[in-house]
A protein has these predicted regions:
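Mid-to-C-terminal secondary-structure elements
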Residues: 56-69, 80-173
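Phosphate-binding glycine-rich loops and adjacent basic patches that engage nucleotide phosphates
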Residues: 15-26, 44-54, 119-131
Length: 173
């Protein structure tokens, strides 16, 4: 007999680590800190599970996400606006504009301020909405993911070894 324990737990990194890595490793060209959170969406008669990415403009630039319509207010700290992907906008609103419409994400009312390009469902980072990174920027708050873009010619394995050798220092400073 064998038994197993399954878990869908994810582990995160502290927000300040992205900047610290870039500042201490010239091999890193750019970075983005983000969080992807499953949310319960309520709008009109629609109730469904959606994914919200909390990120800043560096994430949009690094991942080539474009604003199709609307503004960038959803990226401002403390904003009550969100962006919706083209796919989710079509699913929820058909041919009508979602801009200015109110949605409820995990019991928090938000206004749709922009439509952005999405990745469909082919990515493990799929998302339906995007909002600001309104979280504490503390070393002991571990809930973020960090993407890094390496400079041309950098060996990722060598950089990983270098980063691992210095990692405890990065966290404990």
């Amino acid at each position: 007999d064998s038994s197993s324990i399954a878990s869908n737990r994810e582990f995160g990194l502290p927000y300040p680590l992205g900047k610290r890595l870039k500042d201490n490793h010239p091999e890193i060209e750019d970075y983005a800190v983000f969080n992807r959170i499953p949310n319960r969406l309520y709008t009109g008669n629609v109730r469904k599970e959606v994914n919200l990415i909390s990120a800043d403009s560096s994430f949009m630039n690094l991942m080539h996400i474009k604003i199709v319509a609307g503004n960038t207010h959803f990226m401002m700290k403390g904003s009550k606006e969100v962006a919706i992907t083209e796919q989710m906008a079509e699913e929820l609103y058909g041919n009508h504009s979602p801009l200015g419409k109110e949605v409820e994400l995990d019991n928090e009312k938000r206004t749709i301020g922009a439509i952005v390009t999405g990745w469909g469902k082919h990515s493990h980072l799929n998302y339906d909405f995007m909002g600001d990174l309104n979280y504490p920027e503390m070393w002991d708050f571990h809930m973020f993911r960090i993407l890094i873009k390496l400079r041309e010619g950098v060996n990722p394995d060598e950089l990983q070894q270098k980063m691992n050798a210095n990692f405890p220092k990065e966290i404990t400073d």
